[in-house]
């Protein structure tokens, strides 16, 4: 009897479910830091760093938003990968890995027309915003990792790449957005924007501690659960976190206080995809943003900030989710509604929190002035 053929499969999100049916996300492996400190291996420089991103991916979307809000478009270049996962080594029948691919606009290019199971579509073979890899001319994101010696990791985006040293700096989105916020001010066109102000750091850490596990990752814990018990635990936590965000945002403009921060980016990228994808695909239908006036207005407020709408491509978001996992959606049928991005273009009233805050501040100053006048009067009366 011949030995069984070992089928190679680099890891994807679908491979991160434990024996009890719980989705457990693998930690990012590349965690270096861009720093202005003397002797830093990765100092901030213009045109040195490159971001590999996907419009579909909420983790990558974080970096696109931070880059836009800080005005780093002319400082850090980007390449947007194709939305639908494909076989990364289609000529090797023993390697079943599927993942992010780069666009191939050549006439002979093997562009995306179906899902990795050969079903669904036909989908557009290319998009104007999706490009070939400008550094290695790689066909897949997997190839980028392999170029720097990562042969068996999880080949994810975003990737912050150092073109000078030809290596990956980081693939941890939460740390990349901190670097974009703090380390490139001398080059940023919006250097006055601080997305992690010192006086809000404690509040940010507090909200981030439940936004990530229960919402950002919570939707995946619901969608990739393989037992009812695992799903029930995840959906209970997600529902509670959704309500918690709604409660906080009913009394203040932003999730960590009176200013927009990185925590709002973290929350927004999940809420943006919630009704269009997660409610249906990941079975998070206990709540919806459209049915929450508070969260819908909050999303409108952020979407309408200069530069944010340009980071959103709902078409690619939906194509990725509904067409990249044949185990979840074999025929890659894409639901038509609910046109959430159109909802975000309507006016919002979140600015009323600023008016209220100014009135409270003015009232406080007025009270102090009254107290000061009374003190002066008492001094005069004693002379």
Give the location of each predicted region.
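C-terminal alpha-helical interaction module
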Residues: 1-383
């Amino acid at each position: 009897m011949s030995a069984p053929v070992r089928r190679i499969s680099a890891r994807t999100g679908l491979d991160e479910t434990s024996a009890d049916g719980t989705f457990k996300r693998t930690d990012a492996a590349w965690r270096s830091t861009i720093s202005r400190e003397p002797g830093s291996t990765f100092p901030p420089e213009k045109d040195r760093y490159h971001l590999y991103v996907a419009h579909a991916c909420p983790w990558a979307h974080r970096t696109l938003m931070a880059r836009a809000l800080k005005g780093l478009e002319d400082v850090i270049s980007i390449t947007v990968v194709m939305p639908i996962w494909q076989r990364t080594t289609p000529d090797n029948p023993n390697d079943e890995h599927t993942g992010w691919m780069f666009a191939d606009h050549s006439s002979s290019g093997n562009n995306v027309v179906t899902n990795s199971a050969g079903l669904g579509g036909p989908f557009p073979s290319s998009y104007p915003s999706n490009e070939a890899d400008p550094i290695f001319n790689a066909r897949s994101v997997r190839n980028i990792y392999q170029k720097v010696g990562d042969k068996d990791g999880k080949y994810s985006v975003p990737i912050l790449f150092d073109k000078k040293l030809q290596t990956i700096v980081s693939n941890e989105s939460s740390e990349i957005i901190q670097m974009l916020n703090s380390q490139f001010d001398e080059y940023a066109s919006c250097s006055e924007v601080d997305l992690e102000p010192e006086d809000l750091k404690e509040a940010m850490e507090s909200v981030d501690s439940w936004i990530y596990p229960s919402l950002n990752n919570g939707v995946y814990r619901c969608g990739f659960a393989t037992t009812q018990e695992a799903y029930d635990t995840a959906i209970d936590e997600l529902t509670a976190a959704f309500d918690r965000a709604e409660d906080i945002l009913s009394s203040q403009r932003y999730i960590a206080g009176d200013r927009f921060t990185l925590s709002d980016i973290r929350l927004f990228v999940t809420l943006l995809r919630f009704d269009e994808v997660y409610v249906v695909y990941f079975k998070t239908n206990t709540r919806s943003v459209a049915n929450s006036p508070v969260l819908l207005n909050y999303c409108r407020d952020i979407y309408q900030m200069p530069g944010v709408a340009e980071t959103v491509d709902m078409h690619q978001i939906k194509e990725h989710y509904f067409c990249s996992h044949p185990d979840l959606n074999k025929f890659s049928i894409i639901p038509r509604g609910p046109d959430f991005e159109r909802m975000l273009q309507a006016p919002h009233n979140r600015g009323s929190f600023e008016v209220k805050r100014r009135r409270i501040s003015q009232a406080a100053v007025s009270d102090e002035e009254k107290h000061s006048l009374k003190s002066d009067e008492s001094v005069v009366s004693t002379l």
